[in-house]
From Swiss-Prot:
NAD(+) binds at R13, I14, D35, R80, N316. This is Glyceraldehyde-3-phosphate dehydrogenase. Homotetramer. Pfam families: Gp_dh_C, Gp_dh_N. It comes from Sclerotinia sclerotiorum.
Length: 338
């Protein structure tokens, strides 16, 4: 199968990291990018230099109407309205919607007017079906024009929750994500009328925050609906976050038995999605890791055979962006069979 031709709307944090990931993804070919706020010369600069993930290793040339990256032309558009982006011109029939603005089905569907066939929103959506690779992607049947790749935290949590629930049955669970700061936070204290704590400087504080990531697991694993909720602690790190999952299980098991089940899944059906480590890792060790979830065997604890705390890392930028591309390629394969 030929690589899936993809367009990106929004060349911000996730848009650029999706692009970088695509260079390593043989099944994806980025052919077009749209961003009304970034000129091509600036786009080249932002792609080349990244404070968190380092300098781009490939060749970038600025053209009159786009970029040439590693010898391949990428068309650039500057349309504010998704309906006006001529995706068909570049045969970009699959689009990553990464502006963070057009996250509903109705808004994201505007891409179809320009020739896109399918849109993957790189964020949770209020109404678009959500898919998490390794968890419920096989339920995709090609009918939806707009789908969501859920959130980075849901992508970390859901594979782990699936393994535990499949083997031991989850009765109830609470999650905390210790999450790196993101672009929505403040460099210094500033006004934030809807979230007072969120207006405090990200660089100096641990900031309690809400997250819908745990509840979203109930959408991709229906049997966990109502059994799982969670919160977030925003911390002063640039990338790599960690899920702390405290779970009560029906089938009694020692922590060692639970570890073995997770290890088996990581080396089997969830290989490439879920990883397993017994190393003494810290957050920066996962910078640039492609996995959705890296289970830390040494960090977890159990109170008894029915009550356990599990810890799993994720690069909330890099690993998530890789799953966006994996989902795009997966749905294109399903679509091509129909």
């Amino acid at each position: 199968m030929a690589p899936t031709k993809v367009g990106i709307n929004g060349f911000g944090r996730i848009g650029r990291i999706v692009f970088r990931n695509a260079i390593e993804h043989d099944d994806i070919d980025i052919v077009a990018v749209n961003d009304p706020f970034i000129e091509t010369e600036y786009a080249a600069y932002m792609l080349k230099y990244d404070s968190t993930h380092g300098q781009f290793k490939g060749d970038i040339k600025v053209l009159s109407d786009g970029l040439e990256v590693n010898g391949k032309k990428v068309k650039f558009y500057t349309e504010r309205d998704p309906a006006n982006i001529p995706w068909a011109e570049s045969e970009a029939y699959y689009v990553v919607e990464s502006t963070g603005v057009f996250t509903t089905t109705e808004k994201a569907k505007a891409h179809l007017k320009g020739g896109a066939k399918k849109v993957v929103i790189s964020a949770p959506s209020a109404d678009a079906p959500m898919y998490v690779m390794g968890v419920n992607n096989e339920t995709y049947n090609g009918e939806a024009d707009v789908i969501s790749n859920a959130s980075c935290t849901t992508n970390c949590l859901a594979p782990l929750a699936k393994v535990i629930n499949d083997e031991f049955t989850i009765i109830e669970s609470l999650m905390t994500t210790i999450h790196s700061y993101t672009a929505t936070q403040k460099t210094v204290d500033g006004p934030s009328a809807k979230d007072w704590r969120g207006g405090r400087t990200a660089a100096q504080n641990i900031i309690p925050s809400s997250t819908g990531a745990a509840k979203a697991v109930g959408k991709v694993i229906p049997e966990l609906n109502g059994k799982l909720t969670g919160m977030s602690m925003r911390v002063p790190t640039a990338t790599v976050s960690v899920v702390d999952l405290t779970v009560r299980i029906e089938k009694a098991a020692s922590y060692d038995e639970i570890k073995e089940v997770i290890k088996k899944a990581a080396n089997g059906p969830l290989k490439g999605i879920l990883a397993y480590t017994e190393d003494d890792v810290v957050s920066t060790d996962m910078n640039g890791d492609n996995h959705s979830s890296i289970f830390d065997a040494k960090a977890g604890i159990s109170l008894n055979k029915n009550f356990v705390k599990l810890v799993s890392w994720y690069d909330n930028e890099w690993g998530y962006s890789r799953r966006v591309l994996d989902l795009l390629h997966y749905i294109s394969k399903v679509d091509n069979k129909q």
